[in-house]
């Protein structure tokens, strides 16, 4: 669990909830950093979501595990639809924010610590580029196998990522080469988030092309069924369990 000083992301969403202006800093391990006011989109209502995110929600069925639930926007939308949903996040303050906003079942739990005690799910939801929480190729394949044990026979994973090779930014292209030289995937970011005096530990966040995603998923008991594109480099994958019945 993140300590109070490490929970920079949680402090960002908590402060936004309470009307405090903010700027977050994302720092990468090659020295690159960026600042943004991203918090409003963590709170956006469904009608303000990007079109591709709205479109994929028709694939979100049954009992849902929202991985990296943040401020709870997906949980709240699914609750309004009448679906049971459990939101998990490594950030204690993000979970506190979810609860204050009305999320019924929000738990402080890192993705790597998911367990059978959570119950069985029909959809694993990973929006907001949260395929990135798989971290890297090996950990992704390990977690995908774990997810098989937590999901129903006709389960799906609905996961958003960013096709990193579409960039023309020389800093990002240089980072891709830097990663490949040290045996990492091009889009395997090593980052941390800063906000005022708060700073997360360094963590891996994985962005992949559609072909890379297919290769990661292959042989784990899941398969990519389709991709839904956005107007930019982000996209959503519908990943189905091997042996899933059509129409289920």
Predicted regions and their residues:
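N-terminal auxiliary segments of SAM/dcSAM-dependent transferases
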Residues: 1-27
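Conserved alpha-helix/loop element of class I SAM-dependent methyltransferases that forms part
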Residues: 43-63
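A short glycine-rich, Lys/Arg-flanked "PGG" loop and its adjoining helix->strand segment in the class I
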Residues: 140-153
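Class I SAM-dependent methyltransferase "Motif I" SAM/SAH-binding loop
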Residues: 68-72
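Conserved SAM/SAH-binding beta-strand->alpha-helix loop
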Residues: 91-92
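Conserved SAM-binding strand-loop segment of SAM-dependent methyltransferases
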Residues: 102-113
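A short SAM/SAH-binding and catalytic strip from SAM-dependent methyltransferases
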Residues: 121-141
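SAM-dependent methyltransferase
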Residues: 11-15, 152-214, 218
């Amino acid at each position: 669990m993140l300590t109070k000083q490490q929970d920079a992301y949680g402090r960002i969403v908590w402060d936004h909830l309470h009307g405090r202006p903010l700027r977050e800093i994302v720092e990468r391990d090659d020295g690159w950093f960026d600042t943004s006011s991203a918090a409003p989109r963590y709170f956006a209502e469904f009608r303000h979501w990007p079109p591709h995110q709205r479109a994929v929600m028709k694939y979100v069925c049954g009992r849902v595990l929202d991985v990296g639930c943040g401020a709870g926007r997906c949980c709240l939308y699914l609750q309004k639809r009448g679906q049971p949903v459990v939101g998990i996040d490594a950030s204690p303050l993000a979970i506190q924010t979810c609860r204050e906003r009305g999320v019924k079942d929000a738990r402080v739990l890192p993705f790597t610590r998911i367990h059978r005690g959570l119950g069985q799910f029909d959809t694993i939801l990973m929006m907001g580029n949260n395929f990135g929480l798989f971290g890297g190729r090996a950990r992704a394949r390990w977690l995908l196998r774990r997810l098989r044990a937590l999901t129903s026979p006709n389960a799906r994973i609905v996961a958003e990522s960013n096709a990193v090779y579409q960039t023309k930014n020389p800093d990002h292209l240089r980072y891709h080469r830097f990663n490949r030289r040290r045996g990492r995937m091009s889009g395997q970011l090593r980052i941390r988030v800063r906000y005022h005096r708060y700073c997360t530990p360094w963590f891996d966040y994985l962005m992949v092309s559609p072909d890379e995603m297919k290769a990661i998923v292959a042989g784990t008991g899941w398969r990519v069924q389709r991709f839904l594109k956005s107007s930019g480099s982000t996209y959503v994958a519908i990943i189905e369990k091997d042996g899933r019945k059509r129409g289920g």
